[in-house]
């Protein structure tokens, strides 16, 4: 099936009992066992099946199958938020004493997790620019457990050369984890460029309407965990789960299996089935919405780029952008709908611009059907110091726009009057 069809049909074909066409909401905590042996087999991972909604749920399962199909993966795991998905993905491969290498241009919450929370737990995170493959490679050592990046950076708008990054990481036997939230599988499928694991904030474009928080991890099933000395957690017995060896018990699904039964089970960041249902509704129209998002964003970027009050515009759809050529290869020249710009009067002008907006909403979400604006230095990246913000690709004058699917004339009209107010 094509991606547009997978978004509507993958993972579900009428309820077997009621023949209902809509995916049911299984609002339950638990599932009964046929007998004692059935329960034991489920807990020993000898048989697939439902145990407890903190670990799995039939509504969530449909969403997981659908997202996995769209990304071209073998399986997915849905979680309570995108940050939960990123945290669990790292915890699946790394522990105290290990390190990961990350592209520095990151969403503020991820940067904070990497710069402060993980180091407090004994996991070191080393960063370099996504534009400098050699610098990233120099950070890898025997204790490196993953290389992390965002396919399209938020809010920096950088587009990462996933093929070059993956080739370099695999040369050292390191898996690549890609946050594909901004691009979505409609614009970019990281597995096709060599990535091993994908994470999503489903809250954004996949949900699409600013109603529901959720996250997902998708496993390509291609990374060689078995007999890999860098990853004993996958090829040696796990004492916390009756000595199971994930690479043997789960084969190519070793990563996503361990993610489910270790960080999700033990940390508890489960996605509620009602949220899964809401996210499924958004997912069905992803392709249609992304076409409009990208079309509108390109026109807004071109408008801003020609405006006398604007000092710079960062959108990889503009030919003078340094990531334009990479965007042609990674996202077929459609770099989603997050753009940033600066006003010649600096941070003060940016604040006046945001305060003057009437149609565009002032808030920190992205990927909504509605157009949104924020000032990252005082919101999403506020916890970062000046050097950290610079590393993450955020300047004090940066205004981030998440362009929605309204008529583009109305979006530009609101930007025009707000710029006039910012003089």
Q: Which role does the model predict for each range below?
A:
Residues 1-57, 65-66:
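N-terminal "arm"/small-domain region of PLP-dependent enzymes with the aminotransferase-like
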Residues 35-87, 109-117:
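Conserved N-terminal alpha-helix of the aminotransferase class I/II PLP-enzyme fold
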Residues 7-16, 76-306:
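Conserved PLP-enzyme active-site core in the AAT-like
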Residues 152, 181-183, 318, 344, ...:
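Active-site beta-loop-alpha junctions enriched in small/polar residues
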Residues 72, 143, 309-312, 359, ...:
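Glycine-centered tight turns that cap/initiate beta-strands
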Residues 267-270, 274-276, 281, 285, ...:
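Conserved small-domain helix->loop->beta segment predominantly found in fold-type I
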Residues 115, 124-125, 142, 289, ...:
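PLP-dependent enzyme catalytic core of the Aspartate aminotransferase-like
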């Amino acid at each position: 099936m094509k991606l547009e069809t997978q978004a509507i049909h993958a993972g579900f074909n009428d309820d077997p009992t009621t023949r209902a066409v809509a995916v049911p909401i299984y609002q339950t905590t638990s599932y009964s066992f046929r007998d004692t042996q059935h329960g034991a087999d489920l807990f020993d991972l000898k048989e697939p099946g439902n145990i407890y909604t903190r670990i799995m749920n039939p509504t969530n399962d449909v969403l997981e199958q659908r997202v996995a199909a769209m990304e071209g993966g073998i399986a997915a795991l849905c979680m309570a938020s995108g940050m939960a998905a990123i945290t669990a993905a790292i915890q699946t491969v790394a522990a105290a004493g290990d390190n990961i290498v990350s592209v520095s241009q990151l969403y503020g919450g991820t940067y904070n997790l990497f710069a402060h929370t993980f180091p407090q737990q004994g996991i070191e995170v080393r960063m370099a620019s996504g534009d400098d493959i050699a610098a990233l490679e120099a950070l890898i050592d025997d204790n490196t457990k993953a290389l992390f990046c965002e396919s399209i950076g938020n809010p920096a708008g950088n587009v990462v050369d996933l093929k070059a990054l993956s080739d370099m990481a695999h040369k050292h036997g390191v898996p690549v984890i890609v946050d594909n939230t901004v691009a979505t599988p409609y614009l970019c499928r990281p597995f096709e460029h060599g990535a091993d694991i994908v994470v999503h904030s489903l809250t954004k474009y996949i949900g699409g309407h600013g109603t529901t928080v959720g996250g997902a991890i998708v496993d390509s099933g291609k990374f060689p965990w078995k007999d890999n000395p860098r990853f004993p957690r996958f090829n040696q017995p796990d004492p916390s789960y009756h000595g199971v060896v994930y690479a043997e018990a789960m084969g190519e699904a070793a990563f996503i299996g361990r993610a489910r039964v270790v960080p999700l089970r033990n940390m508890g960041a489960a996605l509620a089935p009602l949220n899964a249902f809401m996210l499924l509704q958004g997912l069905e129209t992803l392709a249609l919405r992304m076409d409009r998002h990208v079309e509108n964003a390109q026109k807004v970027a071109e408008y801003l780029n020609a405006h006398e009050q604007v000092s710079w515009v960062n959108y990889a759809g503009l030919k003078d952008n340094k990531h334009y050529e990479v965007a042609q290869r990674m996202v077929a020249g459609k770099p989603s709908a997050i753009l940033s710009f600066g006003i010649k009067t600096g941070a003060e002008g940016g604040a006046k611009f945001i305060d003057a907006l009437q149609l565009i909403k002032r808030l920190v979400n992205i990927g909504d059907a509605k157009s949104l604006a924020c000032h990252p230095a005082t919101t999403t990246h506020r916890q970062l110091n000046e050097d950290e913000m610079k590393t993450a690709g955020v300047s004090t004058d940066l205004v981030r726009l998440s362009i929605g699917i309204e008529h583009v004339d109305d979006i530009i009209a609101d930007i025009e009057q707000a710029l006039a107010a910012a003089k």
